[in-house]
Amino acid sequence: MNKIESQNAPEPVGLYPHARQVGNFLFLSGIGPRERGKKEIPGVELDQNGNIISYDIEVQCQSVFKNVRSVLEDAGSNWDNLVDVTVFLTNMKDDFESYNRIYKEYFMDNQPCRTTVEILSLPTPIAIELKCIAII
């Protein structure tokens, strides 16, 4: 069982690796849209207390997909090797349509299994997080 620490994806917000390789399987931890080395979150405007004023789900989707790709590639895998994606949205009603359209653009060729769930919040002020399984 190998621990994967990406040099391109954002730093984890807790004590966990970006991914674990077990045999030919790669299990990714929850990946959000933050950029490596930055506190700002793409597409998010916060007030002085850190509360969300507004956010752009499309910008966050594109950023989170970029981060997932970084972890996959740093682990020796690639986008086409994704087999399962669990998506966590904090606002299913307002964001699902945009997210689903962008998801389709990224996954037209490789169509992994997918589950999308709405949750109350995520550990940082983000609107989307992905948990993925891939093969190496």
Residue ranges and their predicted role:
Residues 1-136:
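Short, polar/acidic, helix-capping and beta-turn segments at strand->helix junctions
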